[in-house]
């Protein structure tokens, strides 16, 4: 064919001397090709579609209980209930032996192949009971394993990626804290800056454009910062905040870290409700997932302080899962009829929960020890409308705020319940005392806020009318009823923010943007009353030395930014930042020093004062020197620019004279200058004479 084509071409254009005859690629007569199609086109043949044999939607379930015919129906109900959660099952086969006893495996056919794949993914290694753990595989996997090549090829060696020190932020010799500031630069585009709170001016560590779509969140110990994106979330850390791990969960709206930072919980919407996934942070592996109905609220999981257990509330039950397997504790839920709420102790494996009133049975608050599931304390309550559980951070006390009523009004069908004559009780459980005694404080006014002192024995309450409320401080001591130590009257605050170290508290009105700083040691003196109009957030730093108030663009669009104060309310810094979103201090891990060592340091603290003061003076001197040098450099730059412009102006003098009719206007004197003296009041002082 090539030769014929060249002949035709040469016949039509014999004068084309540049034309070269094409080579002949025809095989010689009798040629036999010894290369197979698999060797020649193996990569393409591997992708060719194969004829479906109808078993893609079949799964094989191994390690099921071997039961007699009389128990087979019950077994089918249990297994069908599990596997039907992932799709419609069209056929099930349980092979049996000669005696009719099941052989320990079964075949299940789903309506669609993707349903079978989902069932394998979710139920493989599912623990049915202590003696039976499912091994679930696709039927087509047998064919895949049959075709394993006999010649083993070693896996390619992956280079080891050295991870930077995740705890370098606590190695600063001066122990300066870090914080992050987020600001929206475009829709779904948030810039995040990381700063170190050094003196006299904060130092910028890193700034990332388009770092997150919405907001960021620190992990409890400050090791990681999490960012939100359409495909899922990612965590960052190290000295330069490089990516540590990513977790694919589209549409994630909220995340929770476990207290020891071993696990991450992501919450994302689905057409039928919320999908919740628990991840292993170090490996990025999905440990377990849940689908909650649309009525479920965020943060439905509660972690124990040591990451050994995670719990969630179900209908008339608590589900407690053990880590790292995430199987139910003792393979069953704890049945608690009428349960309405629960909470873990922040320092011990103790769960507090409360049960509503039912059929003339009083409401009840119970403390349960885990994993023994032993009830260590009960408290019956009457005429209860609602309860809130408040643990003190040190785990020494539990306060149960009880909303009580004098009269209950129901309609004919009991669909609408109204509580009349409301009053409130605070039940204080002394967790460190023998038999856990309980004290009660009753208040007849509306309760607006409650807050424990994190490391002390005091708690504070806002009660009364919204615009003219009272703030009461109570002290809890062993063997005596909680005593009222101070009441600040006619305050317009809505929230209470204790310092992480105790003693100081900020009473905030997050509607008006007013704040009062109170020292709870010296007769509860108000040390300062600054204003920050429209402020919607208050953040204490981990050391309790600084407080930040912020006006977020989520609330308003003008005058957004943040103010920084000392713990006594003295303003340090005002920052106006367009489209400011959030300010977050970086948390610190707990100290490695023992309590005895900490007490020794506090006892001998005066020895360190001289060294600290000298260091502060040197720092301020150095800062003053740097400031003077900076000002001097700015002055030199300005004078250089000024002299340059003066010389340029002098060079243009002849041009100016020519343009102005040969009149030198530079030296003309004029009487058209008017001087006006304006006086205004700067300050007025009034002195009373006796």
Swiss-Prot record:
* Compositional bias segments (type: Basic and acidic residues): 1-11
* GO BP: any one term: follicle cell of egg chamber development
UniProt cross-references to InterPro entries, sorted A to Z: EIF3B, eIF3B_RRM, Nucleotide-bd_a/b_plait_sf, RBD_domain_sf, RRM_dom, TIF_beta_prop-like, WD40/YVTN_repeat-like_dom_sf
Q: Which organism is it from?
A: Drosophila melanogaster
Q: Where are the WD repeats?
A: 207-246, 293-331, 334-369, 442-484, 530-575
Top-level taxonomic group = Eukaryota
Which HAMAP family does the record match to this protein? eIF3b
Q: What is this protein called?
A: Eukaryotic translation initiation factor 3 subunit B
Q: Which residues form a coiled coil?
A: 595-645
Q: Which UniProt keywords apply?
A: Coiled coil, Cytoplasm, Initiation factor, Protein biosynthesis, Repeat, RNA-binding, WD repeat
Show the Gene3D superfamilies listed in the entry.
Answer: 3.30.70.330, YVTN repeat-like/Quinoprotein amine dehydrogenase (2.130.10.10)
Database matches in Pfam families: eIF2A, RRM_1
Its family remark reads: Belongs to the eIF-3 subunit B family.
Residue ranges with Acidic residues bias: 15-25
UniProt-listed PROSITE patterns: RRM
Localization in the cell: Cytoplasm
Q: What the protein does?
A: RNA-binding component of the eukaryotic translation initiation factor 3 (eIF-3) complex, which is involved in protein synthesis of a specialized repertoire of mRNAs and, together with other initiation factors, stimulates binding of mRNA and methionyl-tRNAi to the 40S ribosome. The eIF-3 complex specifically targets and initiates translation of a subset of mRNAs involved in cell proliferation.
Domain RRM residue range list:
57-141
Among the GO molecular function terms of this UniProt record, one is: mRNA binding
Q: What is the taxonomic lineage of the source species?
A: Eukaryota, Metazoa, Ecdysozoa, Arthropoda, Hexapoda
The annotated subunit structure for this chain is: Component of the eukaryotic translation initiation factor 3 (eIF-3) complex. The eIF-3 complex interacts with pix. Interacts with mxt.
GO CC list: cytosol; eukaryotic 43S preinitiation complex; eukaryotic 48S preinitiation complex; eukaryotic translation initiation factor 3 complex
Chain residue ranges for the region called Disordered: 1-33
């Amino acid at each position: 064919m090539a030769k014929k084509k060249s002949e035709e071409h040469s016949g039509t254009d014999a004068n084309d001397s540049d034309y070269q005859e094409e080579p002949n690629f025809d095989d010689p007569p009798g040629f036999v090709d010894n290369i197979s199609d698999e060797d020649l086109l193996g990569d393409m043949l591997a992708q060719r579609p194969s004829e479906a044999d109808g078993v893609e939607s079949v799964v094989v379930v191994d390690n099921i209980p071997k039961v007699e015919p009389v128990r087979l129906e019950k077994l089918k109900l249990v297994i069908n209930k599990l596997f039907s959660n992932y799709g419609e099952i069209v056929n099930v086969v349980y092979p049996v032996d000669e005696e009719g006893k099941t052989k320990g495996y079964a075949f299940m056919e789903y309506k669609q192949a993707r349903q079978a794949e989902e069932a394998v993914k979710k139920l493989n290694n599912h623990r049915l009971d202590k003696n039976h753990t499912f091994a679930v595989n696709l039927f087509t996997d047998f064919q895949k394993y049959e075709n394993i090549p006999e010649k083993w090829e070693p896996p390619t060696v992956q280079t080891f990626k050295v991870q930077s020190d995740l705890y370098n932020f606590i190695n600063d010799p001066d122990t300066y804290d870090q914080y992050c500031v987020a600001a929206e630069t475009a829709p779904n585009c948030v810039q995040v800056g990381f700063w170190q709170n050094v003196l006299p001016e904060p130092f910028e560590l890193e700034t990332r454009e388009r770092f997150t779509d919405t907001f960021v969140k620190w992990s409890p110990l400050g090791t990681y910062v999490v960012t939100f994106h359409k495909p899922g979330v990612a965590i960052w850390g190290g000295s330069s905040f490089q990516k540590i791990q990513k977790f694919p969960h589209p549409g994630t709206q909220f995340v929770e870290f476990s207290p020891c930072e071993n696990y991450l919980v992501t919450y994302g919407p689905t057409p039928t409700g919320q999908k919740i996934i628990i991840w292993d942070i170090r490996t990025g592996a999905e440990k377990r997932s849940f689908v909650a109905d649309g009525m479920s609220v965020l943060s439905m999981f509660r972690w124990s302080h040591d990451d050994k257990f995670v719990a969630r509330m179900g209908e008339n039950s608590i589900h407690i899962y053990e880590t790292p397997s995430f199987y139910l504790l003792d393979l069953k839920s704890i049945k608690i009829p009428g349960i309405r709420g629960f909470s873990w102790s922040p320092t011990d494996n103790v769960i507090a929960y409360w049960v509503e009133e039912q059929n003339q049975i009083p409401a009840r608050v119970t403390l349960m020890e885990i994993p023994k599931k032993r009830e260590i304390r009960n408290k019956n309550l009457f005429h209860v409308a609602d309860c809130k559980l408040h643990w003190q951070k040190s785990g020494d006390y539990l306060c149960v705020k009880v909303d009580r009523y004098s009269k209950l009004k129901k309609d004919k069908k009991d669909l609408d319940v109204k509580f009349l004559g409301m009053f409130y009780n605070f039940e204080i459980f002394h967790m460190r005392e023998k038999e856990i005694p309980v004290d009660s404080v009753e208040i007849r006014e509306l309760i607006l806020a409650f807050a424990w002192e994190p490391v002390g024995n005091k708690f504070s309450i806002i009660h009364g009318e919204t615009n003219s409320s009272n703030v009461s401080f109570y002290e809890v001591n062993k063997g005596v009823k909680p005593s009222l130590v101070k009441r600040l009257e006619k305050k317009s605050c809505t929230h209470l923010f204790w310092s992480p170290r105790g003693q100081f508290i900020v009473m905030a009105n997050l509607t008006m943007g007013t704040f009062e700083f109170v020292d709870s040691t010296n007769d509860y003196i108000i040390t300062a009353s600054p204003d920050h109009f429209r402020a919607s957030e208050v953040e204490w730093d981990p050391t309790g030395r600084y407080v930040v108030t912020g006006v977020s663009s989520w609330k308003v669009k003008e005058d957004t930014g943040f103010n920084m104060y000392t713990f006594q309310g003295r303003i340090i810094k005002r920052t106006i930042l367009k489209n400011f979103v959030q300010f977050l201090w970086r948390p610190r891990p707990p100290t490695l020093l023992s309590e005895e060592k900490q007490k020794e340091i506090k006892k001998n603290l005066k020895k360190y004062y001289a060294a600290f003061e000298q260091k502060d003076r040197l720092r301020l001197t150095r800062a003053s020197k740097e400031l003077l040098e900076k000002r001097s450099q700015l002055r030199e730059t300005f004078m250089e620019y000024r002299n340059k412009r003066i010389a340029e102006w002098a060079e243009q003098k002849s041009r100016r004279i020519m343009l102005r009719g040969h009149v030198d206007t530079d030296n003309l004197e004029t009487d058209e200058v008017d001087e006006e003296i304006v006086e205004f009041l700067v300050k007025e002082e009034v002195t009373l004479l006796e």
